[in-house]
Amino acid sequence: MLFEHYNEIPLGGWPYRYFKPNEVACQGTGKILVNEDALAALDNLRSHLGHSINLSSAYRSPYHNSKIGGAPRSSHLQGHAFDVRLQGRDKEVIRKVAEQVGFKGFGMRYQTFIHIDMGRRRTW
């Protein structure tokens, strides 16, 4: 479900424990696409890791994705991709746990974050 701004989500209508709507909303517009499977997997990832997760990117509106030079068919546009800041954490541990909770796509080539998504199985 798409909301024009994350503050439109009804009180009590957010079932996710570890992430607030503003953390997974588009950073450029405040829009939020609630992808229930992806958000549940993200919550499970946080629970299984046992430490906080900070996101550098989650849902992106088409406008914001274009503005920042994102891929035209980015998984961020469907609300099922997240860029997880490493902050000294082991990238491979995050990848393994993310795979266990249902993520299939992994962008490992970045220095400061790991990209995880619910798309097709692949690693780059």
What are these regions (language model features)?
Residues 73-124:
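Catalytic cores and adjacent binding grooves of peptidoglycan-active enzymes
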Residues 26-28, 53-59, 86-90:
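N-terminal start-of-chain detector that recognizes signal peptides
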Residues 37-69:
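Extended, low-complexity, intrinsically disordered C-terminal regulatory tails
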Residues 5, 48-51, 64, 76, ...:
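Histidine (H) residue identity feature
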